Amino acid sequence: MNPAFLVVLLLVSGALFTVSEARAWESSLYPGDWTPPEARQAPPSFETDKLIQDFSYAGYRRSEVAIPTVAGPIFDVVEGYGADPTGGLDSTAPIQSAIDAAAEAGGGVVFLPAGTYRVRPQGNAAASLRIRRSGVVLRGAGPGSTFIFNDAWQMRNKDIIRVDSPGSGWATVPEGSPETSIRSDLPGPAVQIPVAGVAGFAAGDWIVLRADASEAFKEEHNMGNVWGGQGVGPGVLFVRQIVAIDEASNTLTIDVPTRYYLKTRDSARVHLLGPHIDEVGLEDFSIGNIEHPNHGSTSGWSTGDYSVAGTHAHDVHGSYAISMTRTRNSWIRGVQTYRPPQNSLNAHVLSNALRIGNSVALTVENCHFQRALYSGGGGNAYMVRITNGQEILVKDTVVGYNRHGFVFSHMQTSGNVILRGRAEHTGWRAIAGGAGSSGSDHHMWMSQ
């Protein structure tokens, strides 16, 4: 964990107040001698006590080390694979070949020299470019020099860059995984997990700690008539790494505290995590999408048209510039959206910019995502969306000209931090007469 996160407010106020003066107005939940809840002799309860959790674990490798600058090997998409940096020819296949070569080599830097690279989904592919192996870094020469230009506008539920591991959601128990019950309630933040047995688990394993969203759980939150399943999923769930095992006491020690209570009543239990990829980086480039050819139409862009086949909104709904799924200990830095010169409207992306899903311990820093073409309903015009993501750090990042800037969605989203972020021009729409919204800088759930 990085203790610097815990003193941000004091550091910011230091120019105006002494420490003693700052403490005169600080929260009673964060006194000068504050200690993490899980380290206290009598840890507080999520149900009965007010507390500030320790969010300093968010980010690449718990923010305990800096994001690496990977030296190589280098896979130059122009010199080695024939990509066209003028933007005249489609470079999807050459860039993907370089990505695949880096993956086969066990990792490396796929380098895009200064220039514009035209890409698009090939055939029925769900993304223009795809990274599916650990250790691959996609690096440009800087966001003002390297431009990835997606020239396809029929991008419904597609991505320009997709980073993902084969597999399924966190609630899926991997074949052959050991399973054990948590033998007593965990009412507050905890790193010591008492279980029925530790057989099959080892230090270093990534695990899932979870409890069902039972009817009793829903009623406990006065949400019995509201939580019909949307956003609830399998219930409270945490992805953690085992750092130690005590076989004598059947106790697992995990790397990051739990962020909500887990009760035996709700079948609290532990199993292994499915496959994820690690050490993937996206660095130093800009990314943009061609606008829809019917952007000037006064119909087909309404708030609900995303679900109406044949409309223009239907063509672009659910598209993302970048998507990261089942990814761990990875990063995005120095990445921006941009307006391709072919666009007559000042639009950078068709709908959404960045989605992080079922991923843990990622850092997004020094990025700028903005200007969606379509800002209708159903999950469009989100600049940074974290869905079932945990311990994600979004740092020094600006979002704007969107329906919603930062979005945390679904119950399995927890431990996430926005540090020195800025959201601006919320509810903006590029299309005259198109869907718009008063929107919000932050949308959906707060982070546990």
List each model region and its residues.
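Right-handed parallel beta-helix
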Residues: 135, 144, 278-289, 328-341, ...
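Extracellular beta-strand solenoid repeats
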Residues: 111, 118, 130, 137-139, ...
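Extracellular "leader-to-stem" segments immediately downstream of a signal peptide or signal-anchor
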Residues: 14-310
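Positively charged n-region of N-terminal signal peptides that target proteins for export
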Residues: 1-5
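Alpha-solenoid helical-repeat scaffolds
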Residues: 280-379, 384
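Bacterial N-terminal signal peptides
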Residues: 6-16
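Short glycine/acidic-rich loop motifs that flank beta-strands on beta-rich extracellular proteins
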Residues: 107, 121-123, 143, 149-152, ...
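Active-site-proximal structural scaffolding
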Residues: 131, 200, 235, 275, ...
